[in-house]
Curated annotation (Swiss-Prot):
Record-given protein name: Activating molecule in BECN1-regulated autophagy protein 1
Pathway noted in the entry: Protein modification; protein ubiquitination
Cellular localization per UniProt: Endoplasmic reticulum; Cytoplasm, Cytoskeleton; Cytoplasmic vesicle, Autophagosome; Mitochondrion
Site (Cleavage) residue list: D483, G484
Gene that produces this protein: Ambra1
Tissues and organs where the protein is expressed, per its UniProt entry: Expressed throughout the brain, including midbrain and striatum.
Description of how the protein assembles with itself and partners: Component of the DCX(AMBRA1) E3 ubiquitin ligase complex, also named CRL4(AMBRA1), at least composed of CUL4 (CUL4A or CUL4B), DDB1, AMBRA1 and RBX1. Interacts with BECN1. Probably forms a complex with BECN1 and PIK3C3. Interacts with BECN2. Interacts with BCL2; leading to prevent interaction with BCN1 and autophagy, interaction is disrupted upon autophagy induction. Interacts with ULK1. Interacts (via PxP motifs) with PPP2CA; enhancing interaction between PPP2CA and MYC or FOXO3. Forms a complex with PPP2CA and BECN1.
Highest classification ranks of the organism: Eukaryota, Metazoa, Chordata, Craniata, Vertebrata
WD repeats: 51-90, 93-133, 135-175
Organism, scientific name: Mus musculus (Mouse)
GO terms under biological process: autophagosome assembly; autophagy; cell differentiation; cellular response to starvation; mitophagy; negative regulation of cardiac muscle cell apoptotic process; negative regulation of cell population proliferation; negative regulation of neuron apoptotic process
Length: 1300
């Protein structure tokens, strides 16, 4: 029977005995358990591990919550029983340290681990294991099991592999846009519906930093080459690439060119499923594909790297020598260059031709892939020929049959490093056509980009599939070379599958060489050049014959001219030429042909020669979550002129406006070779030249800069080196220049459109004109669009040299560039700040603290949230879609956590307040559909907060801390983690309240630091927690028993206790109602303000861990003036200092604020109290040394020391109401808090060690790297929100955070 939800635990238990069930009763009881156990005394117990490992890295729990797996530096994995704390299994076999480990969420006894040498192992605790190695032995950064599918995600370098461990190798892989964008974390939500990825954000400084994952010699050479580039491939190509060169894999029912999922070279292909209806999306889930692959017959099993030509006998047997066509007029050099084969080539970032070695130039022709597929259409039937100039593939989905009279030479428009990898294109007239989509590794998945048109008289028509991703320059290449007669091609019963991959570096390398070879041939047919120009311009009409074409004079001249086609795309008006002298892309000026005729898509005649097997044309559509990226190109061989025609409008997310899409229909017309090939002519006027350069900078959309990047840009200096005035002046110059250019082009727009509609075909042979250039960017906008585009385009540009893409580090005010070290805000310049942080990170990592170093370093990660309900492969190459958190810090899998109910995400994000080192913020985001990505809770920490774990009920969060300090004084306990209660959403620093610290029991003789690498809650509510340290310890902490007197405070957990205001206590003078006042203060105020009435102590606070809410307490709540209690008012740093002066009036506060603003070393001495402040304001590194000295406590420290209480035996804390214990000092992100005898930079020892010495302790600069260094051994969960977690964050008396 279901009853009304009950809130009373006693009634719930009573009703459960009677057999009634209340809604939410189980959750309420579990929450009650979590609340109860936080008051209990926690005891930590070390797990006895074999071999005494030196360090423990990562922890993972089994789905039945009984086993705990831990990875260690001795290359082993130990399995421990949670209940007994005994090690029951040792997994031995990794050659290097396992960096990640995870249990399968639903299959008991299945565990996966990945180590630093690139090996992934899946262990069965009942016996046996499977292993797989990455191709280049890159470290495995993260692993994630899908909860329901037999699927393991492997993050390594810049790739995510999808592996069904029943097969030998992963069946799919997706890549980021560049090698610098490494994948550091993958994580499924509890149901497997969503996938979380963490990927490195490229930045201007990243080229100067070493990669986080070790790289071998080959990768190092590529890495250095990228660092030398003055300009990288664009992040987002100009306007209409997203329309004309990217078709979503969600295209509806493309049965003519269905694309299949990536199949690795050593993995058999799945059987082709029957074609789906044309009304459905041809998307087959990865899980279904996994299952289908099991029974699929295969003839080849090879483990060769996909990017290397395999010479084994099995692979050699699969090569198709019969594909070599008979060549009549092509010399052997060209024949070798155009040998058709099937290729597997790993995508790589773009490298200009001049930076490649001569060996690569000699051998590149054999390795260059093709991104084109040619469809031969005739009356006899249709055959898809997939040709490429690369190593042969090892197996084919079916018999290959194609009988064209001539071979087809293809050079694909280059796909950047983020392009699809191993996409399969199939074309078949029968039902065996595979309908699997390509891996969605680019910003938008690629499908067959072609519109077929059958020629009259049975002549063959060529259809080209191209795809260009929004992150790279589009490139163009050669097309088909065929006879004009009817071909003898016939229908093929087996689908021909081609792995579409492109290596831009090799492509650019060999493009010019092939151009030289091809154009130097005397027997080149007119159709060859005709197809070449069609591809170079994508939708230019084909030229009728050689009589209309000027003959090139030399191969060198041809090479120079053809280089202009590397980025020539008539469809998107992006005419660029790579200048070898300046290493820059420059615009060229073509004169486009015009004609006066009606145009149409000719859809009805496209597939006339094909049987009705569900083949449909891809309709114009839009990609989900991004700008529309699908369109169709029509390539027709009919002799007709061309004319642009509007086919629709589409929304451009980049500009936020609707823009028109044009197509061209081919009629008669010719295009001159010079008009298509020649570079931009020199302009006589300097003003025009400047305008051209400004426009070039604006329109090319230079990418994020690696290495030298923007600071070596030929036109503009690094924005970080500009003063604010110069920076905004350049912005204004750019805006004015662009506005003027747009105004001029808008005036010419209608004129050129009219001229193009009335000019004859003979005008095509005229030379380029200025008007032709002006058509490049604005042809796709009408006058209204153009006026609306001006504001957003300029608004997105933070500096002229950055083009239309704005690095996000310039978007926020605190990240604006500054000139010099000091600025009016008192913050350092970006370059200085980055350099100092790198030095600090190097110093920290030299001390063995790589976790802290990774937080100090400038590298940040973006968290993206992918819908995996349909097993769609994530488009990780697109850095702008599904971004949940733009910048965060990731050290290992423990640096990010998803709650058990899948509703919360906890991660560390960099703070906007820069310092040395940068402080960080623990942020908890919502994963609920109604407020996805909304930041709910925040807390400031220093760079040594490296591990985060949400409690089983999602109401508490534990932060693991690293430390690199040496303990100067003996200590029996060391604070290694903090537990916070998620209290009030959107409450800023008050949204989380610290409830207790996790203390590590230390031997008395141990003086070295103790750091946590991973800390996790045990899966059951109230069961406890576990953590691993850098000493190799695995500790399980459990709540043992309630502390004495805690029940008295259980009913006082209401919000009224936590919101005690100083005004309500202003009349409570110490001594008026001594006993009552003492009790209330013990409950809500004493520890909150750092006041110890009987144990005066000297506290030193250097900002470094948690910034406090700006809150002042009344001085009368913390000042002891009774002579019988010397040193009764030892205030804590934090708001205690700020409230000290509350009784003295606002003048004291104003004075402190003024002195802190001035910076430098400042001392303020007043009657009965003194505050010493050290402020290095220019560097944002304020160190506060604060102590209060009572009049009668200045004679010595004996009396105070005699009254110290004995330490609690608990590993977490003692009873808060005991007056002998120290108040907790939670430190601000740059805070280090000591008690006098214990200068451990990490936390303070037991209260017994405290002293009432009034002498301040000097704080070294190095102390500001550890977050919370707590001296607290008490439970402070009952304190007001301004409790110990904020103790040290106030800037002393000023009441302001001193981290500015």
């Amino acid at each position: 029977m279901k009853v009304v939800p009950e809130k009373n635990a006693v009634r719930i238990l009573w009703g459960r005995e009677r057999g009634t069930r209340a809604m939410g009763a189980q959750r309420l009881l579990q929450e009650l358990v979590e609340d109860k156990t936080r008051w209990m005394k926690w005891e930590g117990k070390r797990v006895e591990l074999p071999d005494s490992p030196r360090s423990t890295f990562l922890l993972a729990f089994s789905p039945d919550r009984t086993l705990l797996a831990s990875t260690h530096v001795n290359h082993n994995i130990y399995i421990t029983e949670v209940k007994t704390g005994k090690c029951v299994h040792s997994l031995i076999g990794h050659r290097r340290t396992p960096w990640c480990v995870t249990f399968h969420p639903t299959i008991s006894g299945l565990i996966a681990s990945g180590c630093l040498d690139g090996e992934v192992r899946i262990w069965d605790l009942h016996g046996g294991s499977e292993s797989w190695f990455t191709d280049s032995n890159n470290a495995i950064a993260s692993l994630a099991f899908h909860p329901t599918a037999q699927l393991l995600l492997i993050a390594t370098a810049n790739e995510i592999h999808f592996w069904d461990w029943s097969r030998r190798e992963p069946f799919a892989v997706v890549k980021t846009a560049s090698e610098m964008e490494r994948v550091r974390l993958v994580r499924f939500d509890p149901l497997g519906h969503y996938l979380l990825t963490a990927i490195v954000n490229p930045s201007n400084q990243q080229g100067d930093d070493e990669p986080e994952i070790p790289i071998d010699g080959t990768e190092l050479s590529h890495y250095r080459q990228r660092a030398l580039l003055q300009s990288q491939p664009v992040r987002r190509t100009p306007l209409l690439h997203n329309f004309l060169h990217m078709l979503s894999s969600r295209s509806s029912g493309i049965q003519v060119g269905e694309q299949s999922t990536v199949q690795d070279s050593a993995t058999p292909s799945p059987p082709p499923p029957p074609p789906q209806p044309s009304t459905e999306r041809p998307r087959t889930s990865a899980y279904i594909r996994l299952r289908q692959r099991v029974s699929y017959p295969t003839t080849v099993e090879c483990c060769q790297h996909p990017g290397i030509l395999c010479l084994c006998s099995r692979c050699a047997g699969t090569r198709v020598p019969s594909l070599l066509p008979h060549q009549d007029s092509v010399p052997p050099a060209s024949a070798r260059a155009t040998t058709p084969s099937f290729s597997f080539v790993q995508t790589e970032p773009f490298h200009p031709p001049e930076q490649a070695s001569s060996t690569q130039q000699d051998q590149g022709l054999l390795n260059r892939p093709s991104a084109f597929s040619t469809v031969q259409s005739s009356t006899a039937g249709n055959t898809l020929r997939n040709l490429s100039l690369g190593p042969t593939r090892r197996s084919l989905g079916g018999p290959l049959s194609s009988h064209p009279s001539r071979y087809h030479r293809e050079l694909a428009p280059g796909l950047t490093g983020s392009e699809w990898t191993r996409t399969v294109l199939t074309l078949n007239s029968r039902s065996e056509v595979e309908s699997m989509p390509p891996p969605r590794t680019s910003a938008s998945s690629v499908s067959l980009l072609s519109v077929l048109r059958q020629q009259e008289g049975g002549s063959q028509a060529s259809v080209y599939t191209s795809a260009t991703e929004g992150r790279g320059f589009p490139s163009s290449g050669l097309a088909t070379e065929s006879d004009g007669g009817n071909g003898s091609s016939q229908n093929n019963s087996g689908s021909i599958r081609h792995e579409l991959q492109c290596d831009l570096r090799r492509f650019f390398l060999e493009y010019d060489r092939l151009q030289e070879l091809d154009q130097s041939l005397s027997g080149e047919t007119p159709q060859t050049q005709q197809a070449q120009e069609m591809l170079n311009n994508n939708i230019e009409s084909e030229r009728p014959g050689p009589s209309h074409l000027p003959t090139p004079h030399s191969s060198e001249n041809n090479s120079n001219l053809s280089r202009g086609h590397l980025n020539r795309c008539r469809a998107c008006h992006n005419l660029l030429t790579f200048n070898n002298d300046t290493l820059r892309w420059e615009r060229t000026t073509p004169n486009y042909s015009s004609g006066e005729a009606s145009s149409s898509w000719h859809v009805s005649t496209t597939f006339e020669g094909m049987p009705p097997s569900g083949n449909q044309l891809p309709p114009l559509e839009r990609t989900e979550g991004q700008m529309p990226s699908s369109s169709r190109l029509e390539l027709s061989s009919s002799a007709s002129s061309q004319e642009e025609r509007t086919v629709g409008v589409a929304f451009n997310q980049e500009t936020g406006h609707w823009e028109r899409i044009y197509t061209q229909s081919s009629r008669s017309g010719t295009v001159s070779q010079e008009a298509l090939h020649q570079d931009m002519p020199e302009e006589s006027s300097e003003e025009d030249s400047l305008r051209r350069r400004l426009l070039e900078s604006s329109l090319i959309s230079l990418s994020r800069y690696d290495g030298a990047g923007s600071r070596e840009h030929p036109i503009y200096p690094d924005p970080a080196r500009l003063s604010p005035a110069a920076y905004y002046a350049q912005r204004m110059i750019q805006y004015l220049s662009r506005r003027d250019s747009i105004r001029q082009r808008s005036m010419r727009y209608q004129q050129n459109r009219l001229r193009s509609s009335t000019s004859s075909s003979s005008s095509d042979n005229q030379g380029p004109s200025v008007e032709g250039t002006d058509l490049e960017f604005e042809d796709f906008e009408d006058n209204g669009d153009r006026s609306r585009h001006r504001a957003p385009r300029n608004a997105r540009m933070s500096a002229p040299s950055l083009g239309r893409f704005v690095p996000r580090r310039f978007l926020l005010p605190e990240y604006l560039p500054y000139a010099g070290i000091f600025h009016e805000r008192g913050q350092p310049g970006l370059a200085t700040h980055s350099s100092v942080n790198r030095v600090l990170a190097g110093a920290v990592i030299g001390d063995g603290q790589s976790a802290v170093a990774s937080n100090i370093a400038n590298t940040t990660y973006r968290l993206q949230w992918w819908d995996f309900t349909k097993f769609d492969l994530p488009e990780i190459s697109n850095a702008s879609v599904n971004v949940l958190v733009q910048n965060c810090k990731i050290y290992n899998d423990a640096s990010c956590d998803i709650s058990a109910d899948g509703q919360l995400l906890a991660a560390f994000i960099p703070s906007s307040q820069r310092g040395f080192p940068d402080e960080g913020i623990l942020a908890v985001y919502s994963l609920a559909p109604h407020n996805l990505g909304e930041m709910l809770y925040t807390k400031r920490f220093g760079p040594n907060a490296i591990s985060v774990s949400l409690s089983p009920m999602g109401r508490y969060v534990m932060v693991g801390l690293a430390s690199r300090r040496i303990l100067l004084h003996p200590s029996t306990e060391h604070m290694v983690a903090q537990v916070f209660r998620l209290q009030q959403a959107h409450g800023g620093e008050t949204s989380m309240r610290r409830v207790f610290n996790v203390l590590y029991p230390m031997p008395a003789d141990q003086r070295r630091h103790v750091s946590i690498n991973s800390a996790r809650w045990l899966p059951e509510p109230g069961l406890g927690l576990a953590y691993g340290t850098n000493k190799g310890d695995l500790v399980i902490c459990r709540p043992e028993a309630l502390n004495s007197g805690i029940e008295y405070y259980w009913d006082q957990l209401s919000e009224t206790v936590f919101t005690v205001h100083s005004s309500s206590r202003s009349s409570e003078r110490p001594g008026t109602s001594r006993a009552t006042w003492r009790t209330d203060r013990d409950m809500g105020l004493m520890n909150a303000i750092g006041l110890q009435p009987r144990n005066p102590t000297t506290s030193v606070t250097s900002q470094g861990t948690q910034t406090l809410a700006l809150q002042l307490q009344n001085a009368e709540t913390q000042t002891e003036r009774e002579e019988e209690e010397p040193g009764a008012a030892s205030s804590g740093p934090g708001e205690g200092e700020g409230s000290e002066y509350g009784g003295s009036g606002e003048d004291a506060l104003s004075r402190i604020q003024r002195l802190m603003a001035e910076g430098g070393m400042t001392a303020v001495v007043q009657r009965e109290q003194s505050t010493t402040m050290a402020s290095m304001g220019g560097f944002g590194n304020n160190i506060i040394v604060s102590h209060r000295i009572h009049r009668s406590s200045q004679t010595g420290t004996e009396s105070g020391a005699a009254r110290t209480s004995s330490p609690q035996p608990s590993t977490s804390r003692g009873l808060p109401s005991e007056p002998g214990q120290l108040a907790e000092r939670a430190l601000s992100p740059r805070t280090a808090s000591w008690d006098q005898p214990s200068t451990s930079g990490r936390e303070l020892p037991q209260p017994a060690l405290s002293s009432s010495s009034p002498v301040p302790i000097p704080v070294p600069l190095a102390s500001n790297e550890g977050p919370t260094m707590h001296c607290n051994v008490t439970n402070n969960s009952h304190l007001p929100e301004g409790d110990g977690s904020n103790r040290g964050e106030a800037a002393g008396p000023s009441g302001e955070p001193q981290n500015r």
